[in-house]
Amino acid sequence: MALKPIELNFLGQVVRLNAPEEQHNDLRDAAKELDKRVSEMKDRMQTVQVERAVHVVALNLCFELLLEKQKTKSTEQILQNQIQQLSHSLENIAARSTNQQPAYEIQ
């Protein structure tokens, strides 16, 4: 994964960084989303202080990330329980089928 330079414009600044080329579009989208959120927050807070809006947006993004991690963990636990139940059911079916004698024999 070769790193290639990318130039991003957001929050009134140009940021140059190196990232894998396949991530460039996602980084551009992230920069646009950040710009949008900060702009909306400035409007809601009725402030021109970009730094203050950035702090609130950063806190909101971290909170959203935390919620998504919790959802993922919960979903993983539910799936793990379902896998265990399915495995147990399959073991029971296999045990029953090996203990049963066939009703008839083909000769």
Swiss-Prot record:
Which biological process annotations from GO are given for this protein?
division septum assembly; FtsZ-dependent cytokinesis; septin ring assembly
Sorted keywords for this record are: Cell cycle, Cell division, Coiled coil, Cytoplasm, Septation
Keyword Cell cycle recorded = yes
List localization entries. Cytoplasm
> Mostly located where?
cytoplasm
- Coiled-coil annotation reads 21-99
Name the GO cellular-component terms. cell division site; cell septum; cytosol
Q: Which SUPFAM superfamilies match?
A: Cell division protein ZapA-like
Kindly give the InterPro entries that the UniProt entry links to this protein.
Answer: Cell_div_ZapA-like, Cell_div_ZapA-like_sf, Cell_div_ZapA_N
Keyword presence, Membrane: no
Similarity remark:
Belongs to the ZapA family. Type 1 subfamily.
Described function? Activator of cell division through the inhibition of FtsZ GTPase activity, therefore promoting FtsZ assembly into bundles of protofilaments necessary for the formation of the division Z ring. It is recruited early at mid-cell but it is not essential for cell division.
Assembly and partners?
Answer: Homodimer. Interacts with FtsZ.
* Name under which the protein is recorded: Cell division protein ZapA
Which source organism does the UniProt entry give?
Answer: Actinobacillus succinogenes (strain ATCC 55618 / DSM 22257 / CCUG 43843 / 130Z)
Which gene carries the instructions for this protein?
A: zapA
